[in-house]
UniProtKB/Swiss-Prot annotation:
This is Non-structural protein of 4.8 kDa. Belongs to the coronaviruses ns4/ns4.8 protein family. InterPro entries: Corona_NS4 (IPR005603). It comes from the Viruses.
């Protein structure tokens, strides 16, 4: 996953990237539609 992520025009580069990744992963695992956030779900099983 790229470390530089832009959400709502805000640059989140290097701002707790592990937390962002974890949030995306958890969101995917419980079925949250992450397409609205611009993230892509990757299966990590």
């Amino acid at each position: 996953m790229p470390m530089a992520t832009t959400i709502d025009g805000t640059d989140y580069t290097n701002i707790m990237p592990s937390t962002v990744s974890t949030t995306v992963y958890l969101g995917c695992s419980i079925g949250i539609d992450t397409s609205t956030t611009g993230f892509t779900c990757f299966s990590r099983y």
